[in-house]
């Protein structure tokens, strides 16, 4: 009887296969050591494992045919079997590793730094970077005195990770800091943490708990996979004090993520105290300030002030303090804090140094140098997607949309997991009038984030701006289905109702949204939309009341400077309702209150008020300052506004032929989506004013075409209806003119008595009717 086991032993198959497995294991260990030591692609280890296992049948076949003592012939069947195994192995390896980098995990980059020195840097390739969302740790010590560490510990780890280009510790969309206080942050369940991590494009997320021990402090670190929501690793980490614990957690996390050991050993890794402060008295208010940034900027500023009083070398606290002082209308003091941060920038890792210099040049009125610094960062770190995002934001604000689009596309190409960049790409294509590319970007964004409302909101907003209101409504409705408790989809539905002139539906939607408000940011959006609805109806007094509520929230969320700017710009609303004295008083307050670098925007507010009062001379007097302001702020994206105001001054002086090119510049494709945004501070969009000038010049067909464009996108726009009435009257269509006026006056049925546009429409109707 045939004994297969004995035959295997006679042919020495177990010995040969065992030797192959042992040799393969040695090769695998050597490969793993080499990958870690020389920072090679981790895919190389997987490649060796796959090759090792796929060739096992060939080794077994050779052992069976040639393992027995004596000479053996090499058969045709054996050759075919070996060839088939080899072909199969090659095909499997090709399918598994096609497109994967099996070389070095880093690339060398040579650039010239700001001192003119040639610098060579080794930067990780995007494929091997890790994005980690860090959530607050739970205090299980039973000691309330340690509650502040719940938020602080996660933030300290995030700051420490900034030293390693292989790992990006990302925030949590400020959701943790929108309620509670610095010592009692929101502690989300794992399911909610997973959702937030996915929104932030983080492949993994980290949370945990800590407790006090006789020897110091101990934390249980939990690392989860975002896609599956499963626990990947759980570690116990301990240290003598909280900041040392943050260092230990950071190191443990890097190793668990698979950052090559050779890279870890060669990378500077300062203790997190060196990146922050040696003073415990400075650390606690600093972390409190970080927590308060999203909800109470004045409280945050006071916390950072306390931190720098305790340690003036605390560069990161100085940097935040500088930003907040500038936003608090304390420009000179803000620059001093930023300069103090630059003197002690040795406490910052390189990425933060670039951010500091960019902010310093932006605040000090040198926007071009800010862009230069941001561009230098992308040259030093050409594989750093976040650097390209920073550059893209600055370029977009400067008005260089093509360069901004290229920078965003570079960022997405470097890290395809950052799907949120697709919204920015879609917005830029939309503002350029490229509908096909815009929709392609938005739909890809939706495909990658099928569970969230944000992509649906993005597409709905696009269709809203392009006048496709049915499509906009459908996407806002879909967003509501995905997130029923989120007020933003309701805001979108209200906007659609206002665009269509359905004021009652808009009011009902606002009432529904009011019951859903969760955060101060939600409330700000609500009051701004409520103000737009009231302004559309000509209830400017109510609109001003909404603006005051929004301004109070803006002061809380963004600081006094932002609030004072909003308060000053509400002066144009006061002028529109016939209250010139209130408008002047608001401008006087703005002039007396705003400090550099914001004081120069007073000229813009004055011009907007003058436009409402038909004061062409004041507009023209303000124009040089406005154009200089836009250059100084690097705000090329708002250059159209200066053209619009100049065109308005020419129209008021009956110089319409000179105004036409300026109106065309102010209403071209790059700003169309903005113009159809129900920006009621403007009163009427440039296309309507452009049409008015064409009508005066007798170019009725062109005027009609422009007004048709406006009303096809915003059917409920009463200003355009009034201008269309004037056009029809000029063409002898009295009945058509009266019908358009009736539609506008129906919108303004409850307008304030002093509301000037409604009064002018009534006067025109009386004239035509008689």
Give the positions of each predicted feature.
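Canonical tetratricopeptide repeat
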Residues: 320, 354-356, 390, 424, ...
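TPR alpha-solenoid repeat register
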Residues: 317, 351, 387, 421, ...
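Short beta-strand->alpha-helix linker/helix-N-cap micro-motif
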Residues: 111-220, 224-240, 269-275
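C-terminal/domain-edge helix-coil "capping" segments
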Residues: 67, 92-126, 227-306, 310-311
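Membrane-embedded alpha-helical segments of integral membrane proteins
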Residues: 13-76
């Amino acid at each position: 009887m045939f004994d297969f086991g004995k035959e295997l032993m006679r042919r020495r198959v177990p010995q040969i296969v065992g030797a192959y497995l042992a040799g393969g294991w040695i090769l695998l260990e050597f490969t793993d050591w080499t990958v870690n030591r020389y920072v090679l692609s981790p895919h190389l280890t997987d490649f060796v494992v796959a090759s090792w296992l796929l060739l096992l049948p060939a080794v077994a076949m050779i052992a069976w045919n040639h393992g027995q003592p004596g000479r053996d012939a090499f058969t045709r069947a054996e050759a075919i079997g070996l060839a088939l195994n080899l072909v199969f192995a090659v095909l499997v390896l090709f399918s598994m590793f096609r497109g994967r980098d099996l070389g070095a995990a880093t690339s060398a980059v040579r650039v010239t730094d700001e001192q003119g020195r040639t610098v060579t840097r080794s930067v990780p390739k995007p494929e091997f970077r890790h994005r980690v969302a860090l959530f607050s740790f739970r205090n299980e010590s039973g000691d309330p005195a340690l509650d502040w560490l719940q938020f602080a510990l996660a933030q300290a780890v995030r700051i420490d990770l900034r030293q390693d280009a292989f790992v990006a510790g990302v925030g949590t969309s400020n959701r943790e800091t929108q309620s509670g206080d610095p010592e009692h942050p929101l502690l989300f369940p794992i399911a909610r943490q997973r959702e937030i991590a996915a929104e932030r494009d983080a492949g993994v997320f980290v949370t945990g708990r800590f407790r006090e021990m006789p020897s110091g402090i101990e934390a249980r670190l939990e690392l989860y996979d975002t896609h599956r929501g499963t626990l990947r690793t759980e570690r116990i980490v301990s240290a003598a004090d909280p900041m040392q614990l943050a260092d230990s957690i950071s190191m443990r996390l890097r190793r668990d993520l698979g950052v090559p050991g050779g890279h870890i050993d060669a990378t500077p890794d300062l203790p997190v105290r060196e990146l922050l402060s040696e003073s415990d008295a400075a650390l606690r208010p600093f972390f409190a300030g970080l927590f308060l940034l999203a909800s109470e900027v004045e409280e945050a500023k006071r916390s950072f002030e306390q931190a720098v009083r305790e340690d003036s070398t605390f560069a990161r606290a100085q940097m935040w303090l500088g930003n907040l002082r500038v936003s608090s209308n304390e420009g000179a003091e803000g620059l001093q804090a930023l300069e103090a941060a630059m003197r002690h920038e040795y406490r910052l890792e390189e990425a933060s140094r670039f951010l500091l210099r960019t902010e310093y040049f932006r605040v000090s009125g040198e926007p071009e140098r800010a862009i230069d610094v941001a561009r230098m960062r992308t040259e030093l770190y050409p594989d750093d997607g976040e650097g390209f995002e920073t550059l893209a934001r600055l370029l977009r604000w400067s008005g260089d949309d093509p360069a901004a689009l290229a920078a965003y596309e570079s960022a997405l190409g470097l890290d395809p997991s950052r799907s949120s960049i697709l919204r920015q790409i879609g917005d830029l294509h939309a503002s350029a009038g490229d509908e096909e590319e815009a929709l392609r970007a938005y739909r890809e964004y939706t495909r990658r984030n099928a569970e969230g409302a944000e992509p649906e909101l993005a597409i709905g907003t696009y269709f809203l701006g392009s006048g496709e209101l049915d499509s906009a409504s459908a996407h806002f409705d879909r967003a509501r289905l995905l997130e029923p408790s989120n007020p933003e989809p309701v805001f979108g539905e209200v906007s659609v109702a206002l665009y269509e002139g359905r004021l009652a539906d808009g009011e009902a939607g606002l009432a529904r949204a009011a019951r859903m408000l969760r955060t101060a940011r939600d409330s700000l959006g609500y009051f701004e939309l409520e103000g737009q609805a009231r302004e559309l109806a000509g209830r400017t007094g109510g609109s001003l009341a909404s603006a005051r509520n929004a301004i109070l929230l803006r002061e809380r969320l963004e600081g006094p400077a932002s609030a004072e700017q909003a308060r000053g710009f509400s002066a144009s609303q006061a002028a529109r309702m016939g209250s010139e004295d209130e408008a002047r008083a608001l401008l006087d307050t703005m002039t007396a209150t705003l400090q550099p670098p914001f004081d120069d925007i007073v000229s813009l507010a004055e011009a907007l008020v003058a436009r409402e009062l038909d004061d062409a001379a004041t507009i023209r007097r303000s124009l040089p300052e406005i154009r200089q302001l836009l250059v100084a702020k690097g705000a090329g994206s708002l250059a159209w506004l200066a053209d619009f105001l100049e065109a308005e001054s020419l129209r008021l002086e009956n110089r319409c032929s000179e105004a036409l090119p300026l109106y065309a510049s102010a209403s071209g494709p790059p700003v169309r989506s903005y113009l159809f945004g129900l920006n009621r501070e403007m009163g009427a969009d440039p296309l309507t004013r452009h049409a008015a000038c064409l009508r005066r010049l007798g170019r009725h067909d062109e005027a009609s075409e422009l007004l048709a464009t406006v009303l096809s996108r915003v059917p409920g726009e009463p200003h355009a209806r009034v201008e269309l009435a004037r056009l029809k009257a000029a063409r002898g269509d009295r009945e058509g003119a009266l019908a358009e006026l009736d539609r506008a006056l129906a919108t303004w049925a409850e307008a304030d008595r002093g509301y000037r546009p409604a009064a002018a429409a009534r006067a025109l109707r009386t004239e035509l009717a008689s």
